[in-house]
């Protein structure tokens, strides 16, 4: 189900796949990058890049580096990992996240993560937290105070952090510094998709 909103936004109530033709100068290799970290067990749901560092969020407890990358080995990482986008070297960014990471957003100086977690670095935060992208420390000034549910999509738009998910209201625009609900989005999102699909949620959106 797709719903168009007044913010020039399209909301997907169920997972969808989007594709577009991109002209390429050469044929893409079947193995375009063999230096990035490997997730042996679990899944990666989202990537975002801040400068020369790539962040990957998902459901995993460790990553390993392929042969030729130094320092190599297996690194314990709780559902989020950061690595050098050019070399694949895993960084010392090690926040402790107690749930799957579904969404990432950054303005270049901060990193927001959306997920199923209830705490980050033992700081109580449900579904949405703001981190220092260099150290992984939680910005305690930011608290969205979500009562329940998870965050599956994030986007910084017009000075607001837009979050979508299963939390009450399903779609919310919060202050990127404090996490307070700005009230910019006041929508009623409800209903069902199919008999057995469960309640409607905002899974992905495009702005």
Predicted segments, located by residue:
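Extracytoplasmic surface signature
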Residues: 1-4, 8-207
């Amino acid at each position: 189900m797709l719903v168009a909103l007044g913010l020039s936004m399209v909301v997907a109530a169920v997972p969808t796949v989007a594709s577009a033709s991109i002209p390429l100068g050469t044929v893409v290799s079947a193995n375009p990058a063999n230096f990035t970290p490997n997730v042996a067990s679990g899944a990666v749901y989202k990537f975002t890049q801040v400068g020369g560092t790539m962040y990957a969020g998902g459901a995993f407890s460790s990553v390993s580096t392929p042969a030729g990358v130094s320092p190599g080995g297996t690194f314990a990482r709780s559902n989020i990992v950061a690595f050098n986008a050019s070399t694949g070297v895993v960084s010392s960014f090690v926040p402790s996240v107690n749930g799957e990471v579904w969404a990432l957003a950054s303005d270049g100086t901060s990193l927001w993560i959306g997920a199923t977690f209830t705490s980050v670095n033992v700081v109580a935060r449900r579904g949405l937290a703001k981190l220092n992208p260099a150290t992984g420390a939680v910005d305690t000034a930011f608290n969205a105070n979500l009562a329940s549910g998870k965050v599956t999509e994030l986007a910084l738009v017009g000075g607001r952090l837009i979050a979508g998910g299963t939390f009450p209201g399903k779609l919310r625009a919060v202050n990127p510094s404090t996490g307070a609900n700005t009230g910019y989005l006041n929508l009623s999102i409800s209903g069902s998709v199919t008999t057995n699909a469960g309640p409607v949620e905002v899974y992905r959106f495009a702005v």
